[in-house]
Amino acid sequence: MNEKHPGPLVVSGKLSDGERMKSESNFLRGTIAEDLNNGLTGGFSGDNFLLIRFHGMYQQDDRDIRAERAEQKLEPRHAMMLRCRLPGGIITPQQWLGIDKFAADNTLYGSIRITNRQTFQFHGILKGNVKPAHQLLNELGLDALATANDVNRNVLCTSNPVESALHQEAYEWAKKISEHLLPRTRAYAEIWLDAEKVATTDEEPILGATYLPRKFKTTVVIPPQNDVDLHANDLNFVAVADKGKLIGFNVLVGGGLSIAHGDKNTYPRKASEFGYIPLKHTLAIAEAVVTTQRDWGNRTDRKNAKTKYTLERVGVETFKAEVEKRAGVSFSAIKPYQFIGRGDRIGWVKGVDKKWHLTLFVENGRLLDYPGRSLKTGVAEIAKIHQGDFRLTANQNLIVAGVPEKDKARIEALAREHGLMDDNVTSQRENSMACVSFPTCPLAMAEAERFLPEFVTRVEGILQQHGLADEHIVLRVTGCPNGCGRALLAEVGLVGKAVGRYNLHLGGNREGTRIPRMYRENITADEILLITDQLVGRWAKERHVDEGFGDFVIRAGVIAPVIDSARDFYDVQEAM
């Protein structure tokens, strides 16, 4: 293969139906406004089913009762999931109280779901409540524009409460990047906010009239923490600081985890290093990467349309050279950086600004009032007295940030009263994560969020049995191969295959810089636990000092590392 130009810059052939849908949508309007008034169905029909995703929503239904409703000759119980745009995950207590009330009053489930893309989702919004939801967000100074479909999604930023000045600078860049890459269409304001329709023609100078070939994800990362999982993202700006001040970014392009079962033309891929840029070129480089992918990405096959496949097709150097040409900027050599972990620092930490920051562990990011643990109410009670801000993390947790010394005891008392602080939560539970999956996700093949808590309890038992109760394995479960749970960057990753069955992947690492290989296909939870027990037993006896589980299974020859995922991800290279 010739790296310089291994494949065509543009894939010719019949465009996918998604491209037709976008081109006929009148800049994302479709007939959504008319569909809103159709009371004969609880859902959106035709192209609108997909177009609403550009407006931050997915049409879902309760899969637990789908068969029952079909027997009764009823349509599925349609409801929307709405995802807020929240670059860097920062939200004020006043905004939080607004979304807390809406979730209680206007959703079927009454919960707020913190996601691993640093925002929140409402699940179960009936069609009649969709417009009020967007209007509420607008009143709070928020929106849901471009949190789904073929656009640049919510921009992540490392949740680093300690280095407060550096975090603030990085966060400001996350916001700027998000705003710069937003769709320019007035469709969102017209449909949801009753903005006046103007006669001017819409233009999309960056995204183009048919937007991007596929979803596009961006992060701003502050080493040594890789909490945002940069290798799951298309475009990454890794902060480079000098004396605590941000001076530029290392740029990495082309990460992504989504695959399709049985299709070896799909694979996860780590992001490639392009080089270093000073701060002043950040937006130019972001735009150039996006427009290159816009023009070169595969619009004939959505399964092969993401940036990672474009890089493999045209070659990293060819793509990089085009970005430099479009931006009028040359990359310098990558500056040194390293990652030491991805987990959140649960509990109190003191920042360099002398303020305190409390990271609350929220299992699977689901804030709801449970018997004896009124989590959602607890966060609302804290919001009523907190003078700083809240930060949603890429690990689905919540940081109460900027707490002065005088308020610390009162906030901790509220957190403990409502079950938001629990000294008995293990390191293993804190380092486990799942996507939503059943009952609301239409793509779910196996349980994830509802499956994980009890599964972790059994893994905790295995660790304790082998004398490793204080240890942890980065464990992730994703309900389908689209990979929202980021299982393909875990030490142990479970990818849903069918109800009660998963593909088991081993050999990622704690830092999130290695993709795990499939060890067993289509097996049950009991089979996974049996394998885990055997391997943890070996890890306990044979590991080196501070050696993580993922590093151990590679060194011990249990499984071979994925070196070049485009070529070796599907190789069966099991050693013992």
Curated annotation (Swiss-Prot):
Entry's Gene Ontology cellular component terms: sulfite reductase complex (NADPH)
GO BP terms, alphabetized: cysteine biosynthetic process; hydrogen sulfide biosynthetic process; sulfate assimilation
Cofactor mode of binding and number, as noted: Binds 1 siroheme per subunit. Binds 1 [4Fe-4S] cluster per subunit.
Alphabetic keyword roster: 4Fe-4S, Amino-acid biosynthesis, Cysteine biosynthesis, Heme, Iron, Iron-sulfur, Metal-binding, NADP, Oxidoreductase
Any Pfam family the entry gives: NIR_SIR_ferr
Catalysis: reaction(s): hydrogen sulfide + 3 NADP(+) + 3 H2O = sulfite + 3 NADPH + 4 H(+)
Pathway: Sulfur metabolism; hydrogen sulfide biosynthesis; hydrogen sulfide from sulfite (NADPH route): step 1/1
Domain of life: Bacteria
Cofactor dependency: siroheme; [4Fe-4S] cluster
GO molecular function, one term: NADP binding
Binding positions for siroheme per the UniProt entry: C484
Annotated [4Fe-4S] cluster binding sites: C435, C441, C480, C484
Cytoplasm in keyword set: no
Subunit details: Alpha(8)-beta(8). The alpha component is a flavoprotein, the beta component is a hemoprotein.
Protein purpose: Component of the sulfite reductase complex that catalyzes the 6-electron reduction of sulfite to sulfide. This is one of several activities required for the biosynthesis of L-cysteine from sulfate.
Protein name from the UniProt record: Sulfite reductase [NADPH] hemoprotein beta-component
